[in-house]
Amino acid sequence: MKIKSLILSALCLATMSVYAQNFNGLDMNMGNLYRLSNAKTRSISPENFTGEKGKGGMADPVKDKDKPNQANAHHAAKTLGQGWKVNPYVNIAPNETFTLAEIEGPGAIQQIWMTPTGEWRKTIIRFYWDDEKEPSVECPIGDFFCSGWGVYSPLSSLAVCVNPGSAFNCYWQMPFRKKCRITMENIDPNNEMRVYYQINYTLTEVPEDAAYFHAQFRRSNPNMTSDHVLVDGIKGKGQYVGTYMAWQVNNSGWWGEGEIKFFMDGDKKFPTICGTGTEDYFCGSYNFENKTTRQYEEFSTPYAGLHQIIRPDGVYRSQQRFGMYRWHILDPVRFDKDLKVTIQDLG
């Protein structure tokens, strides 16, 4: 019996060892945080532009002070020396594009933090995966972080957090196989902008079925038709994972009766998925209205929210502005061939 018990224990240990070796360190959550893997954690910031091991905080406030974006805080750090916050940010001149990160894969972006100055609509972030010439993500920085009106508003969700005083955080997992390049362009022709940032990523094997992260930015100002296109021209197999909308109301009254529609896999006149109203899609109801105060009420949850309301005087007055998000984290919209998403302008 002892021999059998020992053999059984050895088999269990061997199985656990193989199981641990197969874990790649992706898809982290409270349920697997205890698990070890061979994934390597790296981080890129102005204090370590390459993310290389043992290369952080090397800027010298004296030797590097005249080098562009190498010792931007040298005046404050000159008496402290190397390793004391010598280069915590970068400056981006008007009409200049700066490479925030360039990473050799395989691996995945796991978290991004940044706090950019300037007009957020005039700063464009782009993500290039592998050998792409055209970016998979091209979006004003404010809209990418659910702050399209250029005004701070706190947001607490699983995918995006906006924290005091203007801290943008992204938790979308973004795998890549060969390499990743992230750039930021300042399209303001007159003003320099500054950004503090940290891009946290892992170097690890990526599953064969892993898709690449994409984001489209579209603006209708004003919306001249009954439908606003959220995304279009998407070909191939994928899944739609979320929407952020900055919506301005140019007349008085309720504005959110429009239905969101998902046209997929050859749908023409009629979609496969059709919602029941704008506030319904963003997981609210009955005009987002607090029935006691008779006012719109902000809310921010892990999956959906109306986190921003910029009010003139009066509950249904013209020129109110809203920020809303809806993440399909547990309910991605899967498609095999193509996808187009629209939302109606109806009040």
Task: List the predicted regions and their residue ranges.
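Sec/Tat signal peptide C-region and signal peptidase I cleavage site
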Residues: 16-20
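Beta-strand-centric surfaces of beta-sandwich/beta-rich domains
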Residues: 21-347
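Sec-dependent N-terminal signal peptides
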Residues: 5-14
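N-terminal secretory signal peptides that target proteins for export/translocation
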Residues: 1-3
